[in-house]
């Protein structure tokens, strides 16, 4: 079986009996994404598909399996997980299976020509200067050409069974994020990562408190106490409950830092992103930084530690204890 940190792109390697890992390249950090083949009663389930790159050698990949791929399961609608769904389906002849909420958001983002305009306006309302907002959107939407998601997939919900695996709701990194659990094994997508932590951001049409959702997800995983979690990037998480506690502590610290950035003067998500992540970020990283700052600001509002102010000019936040003045 392969060592956790060893991978060669497009090679299919066994990580434990009945589970094989496929690692595909990404043009930006973390430079790779892991997909998984799960052996079942009628063939293999492919979990996630990488980007929709024409150079992905699906015939060579599939030739390494001792049986057909009978379904393709998508953990979430981010480009590096759903982007290759259509090419993978064409190569295998297998149906694509995706969560209902996740597919709805996938269609609104990657299937909607007005999405760049909508998210640009949203960033501007959160304090991003107009010229910077355009730059952020252009940098992030470069992936759109490589997102070939499957229209009208088979829709599933948390609690459904998929060839012996239970579908688990794991929102946070994406609202509709799903994982697969069987016995003491969790195929986690981007819910649990090591040594990095999953990005938890607020975006247009997000659920109102994605960080709160994610903290609840961590509690549920820790309570279930799986032996191992196979992640979408990096090494397998060998002590998932411990890793859940570490990530929760990381966000508690970031919440404290976010709270300390607030006072009586209204500050936007763009402002606070500089306190949390510094000023020297390329546009695509600033996009994530603003979204991450906003998820923490909204969590502080839910916890009564910050106040949210919104009018026709935009959205800003103050410390709850300061009282604050109108934006």
Language-model segments: which ranges?
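Aromatic/hydrophobic pocket-lining residues that form the small-molecule binding cavity
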Residues: 58, 82, 214, 293
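Short Pro/Gly-enriched beta-strand edge/turn motifs at strand-loop
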Residues: 16-23, 138-145, 163-165
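Histidine-centered divalent metal-coordination motifs
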Residues: 75-81, 99, 171-173, 177, ...
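Metallo-beta-lactamase
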Residues: 44-53, 140-151, 166-255
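Short, contiguous alpha-helical
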Residues: 90, 170, 301
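Active-site HxH/HxHxD metal-binding segment of metal-dependent hydrolases
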Residues: 59-157
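C-terminal regulatory/interaction regions
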Residues: 1-6, 257-327
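Conserved beta-strand hairpin/beta-sheet module of binuclear metal-dependent hydrolase folds
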Residues: 9-67, 179-194
